[in-house]
Design a protein with these regions (language model features):
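Noncatalytic, solvent-exposed loop/strand surfaces
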Residues: 1-197
Length: 197
């Protein structure tokens, strides 16, 4: 994970979920440097987060992401990381058991954390859904949403990123769309088939 000078300026808007504030992957920021030096922008910091394909979310001066510590030794864990956006100092991390599961790729988590106010939501490859405190990483609630909805895992595991609209948290697990109360984790409804491709 590396942060570059144009991405970590205090004036920059938050990017608190996958594809940004408008869910279109387009930044509304202005004044971006159109031409970079041959060796690229100045790196402000970098951090080791393990294996995975999670993007980063930026909110309130903090950067959140996921990675897996596994090397096929049987002690694999997914970890949610929170860093100071300006310095790269790790503020907190929360780890839970999760297989690396390298199937046709390196493995690790694929979903991006979603920050909503003082909460961070993450979805792991096997359906582990977590709600953590954004400032301290404490577990507010957690559940395996795939188990509870009887969703079957796709070949590469679940890769969706949570979406918050008002008081509802939406996740995609396989062929199921599921809505939960964002404060309690209670499942409000779930749709779809029990199998996924």
């Amino acid at each position: 994970l590396g942060m570059f000078s144009n991405l970590a300026k205090p004036a920059a808007g938050d990017w608190a979920r996958w594809r940004g504030p408008d869910l279109n992957g387009i930044s509304s920021e202005t004044g971006w440097q159109a031409k970079w030096p041959d060796d690229g922008p100045k790196r402000l910091w970098k951090a080791r987060v393990g294996t995975g394909f999670s993007s980063v979310s930026v909110a309130n001066g903090k950067v959140y992401t996921l990675g897996n510590s596994g090397r096929g030794r049987g002690d694999e864990k997914d970890t949610v990381f929170c860093f100071d956006a300006a310095t790269g100092k790790q503020i907190w991390s929360h780890a839970y058991e999760a297989r690396l599961d390298p199937k046709y790729y390196a493995g690790g988590p694929s979903g991006t954390p979603t920050v909503d106010g003082d909460r961070v939501y993450t979805l792991g490859k096997r359906g582990q859904l977590l709600c953590l405190g954004a400032t301290d990483g404490r577990v507010v609630w957690q559940k395996n949403v795939a188990t509870e909805t009887k969703a079957k895992s796709p070949t590469w595991g679940f890769a969706g990123s949570p979406l918050v609209i008002d008081n509802t948290l939406f996740v995609n697990v396989g062929a199921r769309g599921t809505a939960l109360d964002k404060k309690t984790g209670k499942i409000l409804w779930s749709t779809g088939r029990e199998s996924s491709s």
